[in-house]
């Protein structure tokens, strides 16, 4: 059984030769080169992923939704009762939440995973629970480093097992009342931004309570002193079990050489952690949508990513990742199904007849 260090060491580099071949193929399709814009770049990115065997393709699709509660809820940083985490997790098993509807439309299976819900176990939910909620980051660490490492390893293995069973496209999501607070803390740490720049309203927090949320994030960072150069340290000190879980999906997908669609602000914070832990992960991440949460722009700038969709969404759950899955499939369809210029005897300006 491989250790976490060994798994991370084995993340493959993109296949640049396959990417070059893909670009050459795309340039010869029935269109002016570059005219399908970022769809072309996405197809080339996919071609470079070793788990896809050198060609853009989508097999089975899976949405992994990490569910957990947060001790920082006690600081008044969320309007929803904590029990809503458990209620919504149960609703996910019935297919009635936003991510479930959008994932069904995209043909993706939703895996609802309990990594720290503060309630009795829920039928139909995958049990990877570390504890009933993490610690209150405003007074101490969210969890121990050991807890974070064990959960990362478990999620990586779960993700790789799905890959072995035919999943070639992953999406990440989360569920947890008050979880935008630790996400903002992580973004603040990784980007060097003040809490005021990255703290937003989350699930409709009244403007009158934003200053308290900013103060909570600042206190969490001051008390825990997370090391911005150590992704696991940041996750364990000011993160949460759901954020660790999403990071694990990204690491696991990359280990298998497969793409993973990010969701919104919560996933950006996890992506920052994943890229700090293993920079090679970056090549396997696909940004789905531009979250309406305040700190989104700063997080995305630090990741050097431009999402494909601008929908003013901030639901979370993985809803944006599910919505973007057809875009990935469209890039594959373009690559495989379009005709070629040469077959139609079309010579574009600046090219030579062969």
Curated annotation (Swiss-Prot):
It catalyses: 5,6-dimethylbenzimidazole + nicotinate beta-D-ribonucleotide = alpha-ribazole 5'-phosphate + nicotinate + H(+). InterPro entries: Nict_dMeBzImd_PRibTrfase, Nict_dMeBzImd_PRibTrfase_bact, Nict_dMeBzImd_PRibTrfase_N, Nict_dMeBzImd_PRibTrfase_sf. Pfam families: DBI_PRT (PF02277). Keywords: Cobalamin biosynthesis, Glycosyltransferase, Transferase. Transmembrane segments: none annotated. The active site is at residue 317. GO terms for biological process: cobalamin biosynthetic process. One of its GO terms (molecular function) is nicotinate-nucleotide-dimethylbenzimidazole phosphoribosyltransferase activity. Pathway: Nucleoside biosynthesis; alpha-ribazole biosynthesis; alpha-ribazole from 5,6-dimethylbenzimidazole: step 1/2. Its EC number is 2.4.2.21. The keyword Glycosyltransferase applies. The keyword Transferase applies. PANTHER family: NICOTINATE-NUCLEOTIDE--DIMETHYLBENZIMIDAZOLE PHOSPHORIBOSYLTRANSFERASE. Catalyzes the synthesis of alpha-ribazole-5'-phosphate from nicotinate mononucleotide (NAMN) and 5,6-dimethylbenzimidazole (DMB). Belongs to the CobT family. Homodimer. This is Nicotinate-nucleotide--dimethylbenzimidazole phosphoribosyltransferase. It comes from Salmonella arizonae (strain ATCC BAA-731 / CDC346-86 / RSK2980).
């Amino acid at each position: 059984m491989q250790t976490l260090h060994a798994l991370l060491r084995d993340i493959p580099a993109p296949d640049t030769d396959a990417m070059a071949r893909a670009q050459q193929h795309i340039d010869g399709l029935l269109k002016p080169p570059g005219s399908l814009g970022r769809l072309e770049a996405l197809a080339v990115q996919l071609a470079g992923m070793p788990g896809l065997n050198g060609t853009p393709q989508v097999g089975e699709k899976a949405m992994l939704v990490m569910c957990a509660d947060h001790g920082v809820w006690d600081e008044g940083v969320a309007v929803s009762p904590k029990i809503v985490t458990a209620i919504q997790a149960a609703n996910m098993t019935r297919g009635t939440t936003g991510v479930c509807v959008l994932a069904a439309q995209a043909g993706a299976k939703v895996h609802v995973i309990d990594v720290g819900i503060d309630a009795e176990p829920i039928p139909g939910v995958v049990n990877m629970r570390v504890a009933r909620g993490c610690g209150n980051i405003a007074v101490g660490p969210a969890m121990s480093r050991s807890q974070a490492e064990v959960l990362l390893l478990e999620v990586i293995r779960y993700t790789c097992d799905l890959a072995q069973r035919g999943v070639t496209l992953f999406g990440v999501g989360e569920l947890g009342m008050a979880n935008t607070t630790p996400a903002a803390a992580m973004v603040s740490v990784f980007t060097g931004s003040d809490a005021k720049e990255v703290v937003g309203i989350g699930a409709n927090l009244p403007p009158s309570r934003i200053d308290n949320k900013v103060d909570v994030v600042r206190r969490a960072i001051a008390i825990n002193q997370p090391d911005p150069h150590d992704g696991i340290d940041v996750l364990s000190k000011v993160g949460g079990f759901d954020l660790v879980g999403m990071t694990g999906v990204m690491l696991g997908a990359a280990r298998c050489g497969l793409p993973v669609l990010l969701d919104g602000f919560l996933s950006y914070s996890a992506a920052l952690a994943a890229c700090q832990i293993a920079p090679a992960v970056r090549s396997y991440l696909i940004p789905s949508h531009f979250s309406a949460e305040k700190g989104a722009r700063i997080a995305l700038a630090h990741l050097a990513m431009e999402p494909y969709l601008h929908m003013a969404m901030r639901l979370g759950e993985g809803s944006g990742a599910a919505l973007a899955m057809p875009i990935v499939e469209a890039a594959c369809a373009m690559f495989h199904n379009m005709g070629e210029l040469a077959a139609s005897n079309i010579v574009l300006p600046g090219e030579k007849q062969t």
